[in-house]
Amino acid sequence: MAVGVFALLSLPVERYPDVQMGEVLITTMYPGASPKDVESLVTQEIENALDDLESVEYIRSSSYRGRSSIIVKFIDDSDYQKLFSELRLKVLGNMNELPEMIDPPEFDNISVSLWLPTVMVNLIGERSNSALNLMAEEMKIQLRSIPGVKEVTLSGDYTREFHVILDPSRMDELGVTFDETVKALNAANIVYPAGDALNETGEFVIVVDERFRTRQDIAEVVIRKDSDGSFVRVEDVLSRANLNYRDPFIITSVNGMNCVSLKIIKNKSGNILDIVPNVLEVVDHFQDKLAKEGVQVVLTQDQRVYVDESITTLGNNLLVGIILVSLIIWSFMGFRNAVLAMVGIPFSFLLTMIFMWATGNSLNEISLFAFVLVSGIIVDDAIVVVENIYRHLQEGESLQEAVVNGTSEVTFPVIAATSTTVAAFLPMLIMTGSTGEFFAQIPIAITAAIAASLFECLIILPLHFQDWPGKKQVLRTVRYKYTAGTERPLMAWVRRGTNRIVAKTLRFRWTTLFLVFFLFFVSLGIMFVSFTGKFPLIRVEFYPADYTYYYIELEGPVGTALETTSEKLKEVSSFLLPNRPDELQSITAMAGFFLTKDYRPVFGSNVGHLLVELPQKGDRNFTRIENNDPSEHLNNVLKKIDTFVNDDWSVRVRP
């Protein structure tokens, strides 16, 4: 039990298992290039480099202004890590075929944590993104030092760079091409090691650093030396040069205001229940300083809330189950038998925690769902064993004889019953790919819990039964009225009722069979007409009955500027935001991409999405909505948006 408690406290806690999706996202930035140039010079070259990569199911690519996006999907159950390394080597080995001006490609191994971070820390305010970025960078340093944090990524920041604008007429006049200028600038803006040197104090490394530091450094770069000895420099074809920001491909806002977001991703052993409070401590440390600058911190996508809710559900379910089963067993077999049967529930769960911890699994919504599902099953075996031992005691056997005979008599039936339950869930392990890995914790947790309960009821429970009340206690047997033996009145009443029902069933067996088949086909008919919508006897809901966030996807005409999409998202955010926080918690807007239902990214300057977070169930107070039904709230949102968005924009809403 002590080891089980230690394992429970040591288990990583997360919302969902951090499953590898078997996909790699390759992002390559090519500043200033048109979508057509990106397609021909970057995307196609990278695809060609991956032609002979094995175990690839498909490659899906998109080219945008200044950016190439390629998703490579591997065949299910491949060695994803090995394939990821091979893919990376192939792309980097083909860099000579790519334009010199591109940024090094970024490789993201897509997993659940990439799209569902532990928590998002958003800095919002009427300040420039550069100012917000400086504050976020300072906070990022402390957030990265939190135990259990794998990485902290910054989004919404603008990359600062020096823009050189050339004069086309001067270039024609001097016979200078754009490529010549680019090559000259790249050749001059370098840093490279020049060897080692020794002196009296020791050895040091010599580095030649010729990177640009001033505008004049750029202007003096030689593009070409003519035959007469004259030089053509950048300043000869320069129109203007100034510090600026690279055009973003995603613009983020929260509650209709500019923001810079810090995405916090936990490592495999991290515990959400520990990480989020530590994040709040860091935020509180910066709160006063940020408030003076007019900056507000808003936390979104806090996964701890959902984990807490799942743990509360499991705890309530276990508590109610223990109380009800205890009362039932107490009524039929007495207090001692009830306690002995109930001991199996915590024992089985703690033994399961040891197994989960030893095999590298985690506590999450999937495993917690499995525990809730199995919580009513694990006590069944203990009830059978306790009842049979109790029956042998009633028949006059000694305590030791009753324990031995009662347990051995039901050992094989209990094992057979347990095996059939396990066999019903084990086929889930046959599922392949990321889906199979995602749901694998259900059969693993259920099988471990049932196996633990089997061990407890056949080994531990008989020992407890023998030790309590002890060998010297003389069991009393009382003959109750209306019973045929020494059993309790409630048991006798149930037995008589059962005998009558069974007798009538056997007497009218054909009628019974007809009723069984009739009810079976009636239930099938009800299910069919309800699902088809012809006669909905059972209400079929498109959305889940309860949820705490939903997505609103916007798509504008092709060619819409990213800034226009961002402004449209801000307008919708401001339009939906209520005056009361008990109606809506936050709205996070991201212009430039949205996620499909299966979490596949779709990029484009004309698309974007809103992530709307609702208050928790107990904190909601929707205006003029009965029972604070989120489905009714969503219907109202749809009506509002339909009247707000014009015909040029399409809108989709989904939980």
Regions found by a protein language model. Give the residues of each.
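Helix-loop junctions and hydrophobic alpha-helical segments within the transmembrane domains
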Residues: 300, 311, 386, 392-419, ...
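Membrane-proximal juxtamembrane linkers immediately C-terminal to transmembrane helices
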Residues: 13-30, 63, 110-116, 534-558, ...
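Hydrophobic transmembrane alpha-helices and their membrane-interface caps
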Residues: 6-15, 323-331, 335-391
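Membrane-water interface of transmembrane alpha-helices in multipass transporters/channels
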Residues: 15-20, 334-344, 359-374, 430-447, ...
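Surface-exposed amphipathic alpha-helical segments in non-transmembrane regions
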Residues: 1-6, 10, 41-58, 73-160, ...
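Juxtamembrane "pre-transmembrane" interface segments
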Residues: 153-157, 165, 236-238, 253-327, ...
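Signature of alpha-helical transmembrane segments and their immediate interfacial
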Residues: 1-13, 410, 481-539
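Transmembrane alpha-helices and their membrane-interface boundaries in multi-pass membrane transporters
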Residues: 375-389, 411-430, 437-484, 610
